[in-house]
């Protein structure tokens, strides 16, 4: 990308920061280990011993700091580099990372959501790692959709190395489906089948003597609300942006149809309205506690069921949890949002060699597998994805979703702001559905507002 273009993107990113809410250097070619061969890493030619790398992470699993420290311990022992792992909540991380990039008062490495990488890159405060990624296998070591998250449209560069990935699938209670007389093999094969399943679950009312709702999902309080609703839009033939990424298409007839599928679940009493006042973690806990028969979640939920220290599970829910692929529409295969997190190095880092050595280590196939098994995500790299996906049938469902059903968003600097515009209107639409006063015309009007705001943001970049 030409320098003037990069400057314009930096200006846009700074100018529109007030609209945001929290979502989701020099090198040493010999530092760290060969990312495809060893776990602890080869001895670096240039000693990094005695350096300290600060690493910001988000809430990855139930014990994010302890799990990450466990994973980096062999790296510390082999290289002599100390890794300080610091937790930054998803609700504040966007502002924290932005402020650190602009001020220069930053850690060395930060985790960033895949959809946030273009925005952060446009700030100009992060290293371009393009000349180093051959050391970790380059693009061929990753699925195309995952590698795409490392880049910014229109630029030559790699700004965030993929760390882990995730997709969303249907979670359900086997005992609840049995009580409703529904065969799990056909319960979620299409959107029509999903709705029929929820109608039968609604009639059950109780499982094991305890009340249960057929389905639940979060509303406006969920930072990832757009990730939850866009699959319905995609399944209806809609899209978030035009093919050239210059105009919003969230108000297209197909997008309206997709959003309407979700709001109909609310209006027909199949989606527990009380869940709309909760955030994603709270809804997840409702499922784990036995109060929902079906919900949509990521692979970390499955992993948490295997952890004895996660006491949010009821015995019945833990014993009966199962997963199924997202159901498709009339002419679609059942899309799901595919996301995750990447690792970015701040330009202000005084330990860029050590920072890259850490990223290289965390890109090792076995290290990625070990970390995925700890926190319940999927590795970003192809080979360990296959390894984790083959561990049991439930993991196979997530692996299939990542390979065959996953979609994400355009890698443009404005996406974080556009997503926020969509989130605000999606939340309002769901609130109106819960209140019983939502018409098709109102859905269209609200999505028109979202599209208008998004077009304004996209136009600023074009200027």
Enumerate the predicted regions with their spans.
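Long, aromatic- and glycine/proline-rich binding clefts that accommodate carbohydrate-like moieties
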Residues: 151, 318-325, 372-424, 428
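Extracytoplasmic "Venus flytrap"/periplasmic binding protein-like
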Residues: 71-145, 178-181, 186-189, 285-294, ...
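A structural signal for short loop-to-beta-strand junctions that line the ligand-binding cleft
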Residues: 100, 107-108, 136-177, 327, ...
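Extracytoplasmic/periplasmic substrate-binding proteins
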Residues: 58, 228-231, 236, 253, ...
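Hinge/lid segment of periplasmic solute-binding proteins
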Residues: 39-47, 114-169, 225-228, 232-237, ...
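Helix-loop-helix "hinge/cap" segment bordering the ligand-binding cleft or interdomain interface
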Residues: 153-227, 236-280, 347-353, 434, ...
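Short, solvent-exposed loop/beta-turn-alpha elements that line the ligand-binding surface or hinge
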Residues: 44-47, 130-144, 187, 206, ...
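Conserved C-terminal helix/tail region of periplasmic/extracytoplasmic solute-binding proteins
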Residues: 52, 83, 178, 184, ...
